[in-house]
C-alpha cells in the first residue's frame, strides 16, 4: 500500500518537498491555509524578494527549476553602499567579482514550485485548509471544517507554524524577536529604466537601522526598511515620514514618489529567530521556517529551507524508505546547520547596518579578496562559503578558524623572512 504523506504549507519548501516525495512514488497531499496564490495574489506582509544562491539553485535543480529560476532572476554581484552625503561605494561579493546572488520574486518562485508540484503524479493540492491540530501518534489532521489522516505529516508552514504548535508540549522552543521590524517600499522605474544599478544590492547603513533595495525584472526596486518598531510607530503622518527619510536616506527620497503613502499603508513585519528541539515527534516532522526561522540578513532563509528538503529526500534514500529512521537522520544532519546559519544571520545584521560603512571593514574586505586570489581556493571568505558553496553551514566557522591560523602562520613567516632579510642587509653594510 502506498504511504500517504501530508505536507502542511504550500510555500516554497512545502512545494519543493512535495515534488521530491512524489518522484519517489509517494502519494502527497499538500494543505494550505490560503487560497491558491496563483489566483489570489501575494500575501501582504511577506517579503516580495528573495536572494537565491548556490544552495537554493542546487535544490531547485533537482526538480528542473534552476535554469528557469535564473532566467527570472537578476544577478547581484556586489553591494552598493549609500552614505548620508549620497556618496556611493561598491563591494563585490567574490574575490574575482563574477559570482552573484540572485534577486527573484517570492511570488513568482512560489508559483513555479506550485506548478511543478501540481504536475507531479501523486500530488494533490488543497487550498483554504487552515490547520487547527495534528495528532503525532495517529497522523490525524484537523482543519477548520474538515479532517484528514496521513502516515507522515511534514510541517512546512512557516515561522508561526500550526504544526509546531500542535506538538510543542515538552519541546525545547525559543522564539527570539529583534526589537526591529521591517516595512517594504518601492523605487519605481525612472524614465522606463532602473533608477539604480540593477547588478547590485543597495544598502543605506545607518548603525542601528538600515534600508536595502533589490532589483526586480520590471525595472523597479523593492526597498526594505529595518527599523526599531518604535521608530515606525512615531512616523504617523506624511510630513513626518518625509522628514525622517530626508534626514536618513536623502538620496533615495527623489526616487520614491509614493514614499509617504506606501509607508503609511504597508504593514510592519516582525523579525524572529526560532530554535526548537525535537523537530520530530511520532509521525510528525518540521521543515524550513517551522523548524528554524532565521532573520533575513544573510539571504539564506529560502536556501536553508530548500536544503532541508534535499536532506530529507537524501535521508529517505539512506534509510531505504524507513520513515522513522529517515526523519531521525534528517534532524541529526540539519539541526546544527540550522543553528549555525541562524547565528551567522544575526551577526550579519551588524555587518550590514554598521560595519560595511567603516573604512576599516572595507580594507579588510579588500585584503580578504586579495588572499583569495593569491591562495587559489585555500582561503575563501565566510560570505563566499555561505552563498556560493554547499559546504554545510556548521562546518564554515571551523574552516574559517583553520584558514585564519594558516594565513597567520604564512604572514608570520613572510614577516620573519622580511625581517631576516633586513638584518642580513644591515650586516653586509
Which sequence ranges carry the predicted segments?
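Active-site-adjacent segment of FAD-dependent monooxygenases/related oxidoreductases
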Residues: 43-116
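Glycine-rich FAD pyrophosphate-binding loop
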Residues: 22-45
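Conserved hydrophobic helix-helix packing surfaces used for dimerization/oligomerization
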Residues: 5-7, 28, 284
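Conserved Rossmann-like nucleotide-cofactor binding loop
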Residues: 13, 36, 160
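Beta1/beta-strand and adjacent pyrophosphate-binding region of the FAD-binding site
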Residues: 1-13
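Conserved mid-domain beta->alpha element of the FAD-binding
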Residues: 10-23, 154-155, 185, 267-351, ...
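C-terminal helical "tail/cap" subdomain of flavin- and related membrane-associated enzymes
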Residues: 314-429
Amino acid at each position: 500500500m502506498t504511504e500517504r504523506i501530508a505536507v502542511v504549507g504550500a510555500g516554497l519548501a512545502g512545494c519543493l518537498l512535495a515534488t521530491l516525495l512524489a518522484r519517489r512514488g509517494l502519494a502527497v497531499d499538500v494543505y494550505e491555509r490560503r487560497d491558491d496564490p496563483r489566483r489570489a495574489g501575494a500575501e501582504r506582509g511577506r517579503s516580495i524578494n528573495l536572494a537565491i544562491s548556490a544552495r537554493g539553485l542546487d535544490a531547485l535543480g533537482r526538480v528542473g527549476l534552476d535554469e528557469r529560476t535564473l532566467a527570472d532572476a537578476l544577478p547581484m554581484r556586489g553591494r552598493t553602499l549609500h552614505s548620508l552625503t549620497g556618496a556611493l561605494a561598491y563591494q563585490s561579493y567574490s574575490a574575482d567579482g563574477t559570482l552573484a546572488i540572485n534577486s527573484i520574486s517570492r511570488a513568482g518562485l512560489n508559483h513555479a514550485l506550485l506548478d511543478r508540484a501540481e504536475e507531479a503524479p501523486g500530488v494533490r493540492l488543497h487550498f483554504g485548509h487552515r490547520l487547527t491540530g495534528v495528532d503525532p501518534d495517529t497522523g490525524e489532521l484537523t482543519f477548520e471544517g474538515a479532517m484528514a489522516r496521513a502516515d507522515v505529516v511534514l510541517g512546512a508552514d512557516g515561522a508561526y507554524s500550526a504544526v509546531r504548535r500542535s506538538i510543542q508540549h515538552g519541546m525545547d522552543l525559543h522564539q527570539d524577536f529583534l526589537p526591529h521590524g521591517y516595512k517594504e517600499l518601492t523605487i519605481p522605474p525612472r524614465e522606463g529604466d532602473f533608477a539604480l544599478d540593477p547588478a547590485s544590492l543597495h544598502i543605506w547603513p545607518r548603525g542601528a537601522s538600515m534600508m536595502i533595495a533589490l532589483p526586480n525584472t520590471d525595472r523597479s526596486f523593492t526597498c526594505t526598511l529595518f527599523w526599531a518598531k518604535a521608530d515606525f510607530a512615531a512616523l504617523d503622518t506624511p510630513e513626518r515620514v518625509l522628514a525622517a527619510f530626508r534626514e536618513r536616506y536623502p538620496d533615495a527620497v527623489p526616487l520614491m514618489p509614493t514614499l509617504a503613502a506606501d509607508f503609511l499603508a504597508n504593514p510592519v513585519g516582525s523579525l524572529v529567530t526560532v530554535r526548537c528541539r525535537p523537530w520530530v515527534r511520532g509521525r510528525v516532522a518540521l521543515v524550513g521556517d517551522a523548524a528554524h526561522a532565521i532573520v533575513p540578513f544573510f539571504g539564506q532563509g529560502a536556501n536553508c529551507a530548500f536544503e532541508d528538503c534535499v536532506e530529507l529526500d537524501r535521508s529517505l534514500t539512506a534509510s531505504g524508505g524507513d520513515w522513522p529512521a529517515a526523519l531521525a537522520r534528517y534532524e541529526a544532519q540539519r539541526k546544527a546547520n540550522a543553528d549555525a546559519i541562524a547565528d551567522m544571520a544575526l551577526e550579519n545584521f551588524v555587518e550590514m547596518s554598521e560595519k560595511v560603512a567603516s573604512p576599516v571593514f572595507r580594507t579588510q574586505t579588500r585584503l580578504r579578496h586579495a588572499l583569495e586570489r593569491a591562495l587559489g581556493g585555500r582561503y575563501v571568505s565566510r560570505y563566499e562559503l555561505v552563498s556560493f558553496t554547499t559546504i554545510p553551514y556548521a562546518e564554515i566557522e571551523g574552516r574559517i578558524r583553520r584558514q585564519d591560523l594558516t594565513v597567520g602562520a604564512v604572514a608570520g613567516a613572510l614577516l620573519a623572512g622580511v625581517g631576516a632579510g633586513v638584518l642580513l642587509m644591515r650586516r653586509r653594510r
